[in-house]
Every structure is written in structure tokens, then in C-alpha cells.
Design a protein with these regions (language model features):
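Hydrophobic hinge/microswitch elements
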Residues: 185-228, 235-236
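C-terminal effector-binding regulatory domain of bacterial HTH transcription factors
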Residues: 94, 214-223, 231-277
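A short LG(V/I)-centered, amphipathic sequence patch enriched
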Residues: 16-33, 226
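Ligand-binding "clamshell"
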Residues: 125-130, 134, 220-230
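Acidic, Gly/Pro-rich loop/turn segments at junctions of secondary structure
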Residues: 100-164, 168-192
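Central regulatory/effector-binding core of bacterial HTH transcription factors
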Residues: 65-125, 274-277
């Protein structure tokens, strides 16, 4: 912010005098929020985020840039979207990207000042236009050392394996085991992870085997960090979509990103149509 600690302290003191309440208190050499401070911070955080975004847009526009705010599921952004963004930046050097994340539930695009979002689920979003991107191919994947440690060479061996679970996707193992004709195995046992990125790290560390979208782990499979210990896969129940507010559909930066990501998704779908093993 360009302010010294003492200057920040003075600003806080002015705000506390204006509000007539203490926002912070010292506890064992630590400065922590009071109950009033916590409530106040919660109430104004959204407004501050909007102010920050608006400020960045104004600063970017001074240099001739247009800001595109993309909101994505965390693992999709880190494992699929971000590695491809260099090509978008090369095509559109005047568009500055702002990437944020959300977890599974739809939200108000306009109220959150989001230009485009990546959605997994049904082809619907409140007050949003929807373009289909791609489906998932779910595959079993684990580290080579884990497969060796339990002698995992066929789907029947999953009965003695630790099944790594993605918290919001219990259908992944249910559907994969059904496709492998192993429905007698309990599909819901095993440690649970909030994000696929966490589950992938656990699989690479040898904690167990995951039912993972293949497009998220192609690099890990290629470099040998993960393997598919036996044949088999299943198409996921849902699909990834690009969503954006109707009021922003004609914005140049939105049109540019839509064209680009649909092209990238077509390439992914082409790879997915190849016979799986």
C-alpha cells in the first residue's frame, strides 16, 4: 500500500474513533480482530474486493489493457487452464487476465464482477449463457511404488487398495467400479480430499489410488509420477461449461476468450475420442 506500519496504525485509530468501537486488540504481543472487527471485516470484504478490481481495471486501461476476470474451479485452473494461457496471452497481449476460484456452487456473476466462469455440472447457470466445453474420462491412477507395494495389476486388486476420494465427487469411484465390474467393492471408503489437486498429490505420494479425470494428470502419466495399473475408464456424469453474463457477451475480451477456450476444448475432446485403454 506504500504506507508504513505507524501510518497504518494511525489510519486504524482514526477508523475506530469514527466507528466508536475497537476493531483490534493486543493479546500476548499479537494484534487480533475483536468481535466487532471480525463482523466489520466480513461485511466490507466484498466491497473492498470490488474496489480493488475496479482500481486494477482503471490502472490497466491507462496502459491500453482490457481486464478479463476469469473464475474457475481450482484444479481445472491449475492443471488445465493455466498451462494453456500463454497461447491466449500471445494472441491477445492487450488483455490482462485476473484469475480467481470458487468451489462447486454457482454464484452471481454480475455481483461478483466476473466476466467468464468455468462450470462443472449441468448446462445451466442463473442469469448466465452457457457453452459446452468438454467431458471427463475418469481413470484409475496411482504411483508406481504404491501399485508394486500391494501387487495391484488388475481391477480385482482394488478390494485391498486404499481408494482416494474427492469429497464432492462420490460418483467417480461408484461409476468406475461399476464399469470395471467390481461393484461388490465398497466405493465410498478411503480418505477424502476437498480438491482433485490434493487427491493427485496424495496419489503421487503413495497414499492410495484415485479415480481421476485423465486430462488433469496427463503430464504426471507421461513423466511416470502416476501410472494406470490396469485398463479401464468411464465417462463422467457431467460436463465442463463456459458461462458468462448475457450483458457481457459482446465485450471484445469475452468474445476473444470464448473463441480461444472453445478451440482448446475441441482439441481436448478430439484426444478424448481416441479409444481409451
Amino acid at each position: 500500500m506504500g504506507l508504513t506500519q505507524s501510518a497504518v496504525s494511525r489510519q486504524i485509530a482514526h477508523l475506530e474513533r469514527f466507528l466508536g468501537v475497537h476493531l483490534f486488540e493486543r493479546i500476548r504481543r499479537r494484534v487480533v480482530l475483536t468481535d466487532a472487527g471480525t463482523t466489520y471485516a466480513t461485511k466490507i470484504r466484498s466491497a473492498l474486493d470490488h474496489a480493488e478490481a475496479a482500481t486494477l481495471q482503471v490502472l490497466a486501461s491507462k496502459s491500453g489493457e482490457h481486464v478479463l476476470h476469469i473464475c474457475s474451479l481450482v484444479t481445472f485452473a491449475s492443471h488445465w487452464l493455466t498451462p494453456r494461457l500463454a497461447s491466449f496471452a500471445k494472441e491477445h497481449p492487450d488483455i490482462a487476465l485476473q484469475i480467481s476460484s470458487y468451489h462447486h456452487r454457482s454464484f452471481d456473476l454480475v455481483a461478483n464482477d466476473v466476466d467468464v466462469a468455468i462450470h462443472y455440472g449441468e448446462p445451466s447457470w442463473p442469469d448466465g449463457l452457457v457453452d459446452r466445453l468438454m467431458e471427463e474420462e475418469i481413470v484409475p491412477a496411482c504411483s508406481p511404488s504404491y501399485a508394486k507395494s500391494i501387487g495391484l495389476r488388475s481391477a480385482k486388486g482394488l478390494g485391498r487398495a486404499t481408494l482416494l476420494q474427492q469429497t464432492t465427487r462420490p460418483d467417480a469411484w461408484i461409476d468406475l467400479l461399476a464399469s470395471l465390474k467390481c461393484s461388490d467393492i465398497n466405493a465410498l471408503r478411503g480418505p477424502r480430499f476437498a480438491l482433485y489437486s490434493m487427491l493427485i498429490e496424495a496419489a503421487m505420494a503413495g497414499l492410495g489410488i484415485g479415480a481421476i479425470p485423465q486430462f488433469l494428470i496427463e503430464d504426471h502419466l507421461a513423466n511416470g509420477q502416476l501410472i494406470r495399473p490396469f485398463k479401464g475408464s468411464v465417462r463422467s456424469r457431467y460436463t465442463y461449461y463456459l458461462v458468462y453474463p448475457e450483458a457481457k457477451r459482446q465485450l471484445r475480451e469475452v468474445k476473444a476468450f470464448r473463441t480461444w477456450i472453445l478451440r482448446e476444448a475441441r482439441r481436448e475432446n478430439f484426444k478424448a475420442r481416441k479409444p481409451s485403454t
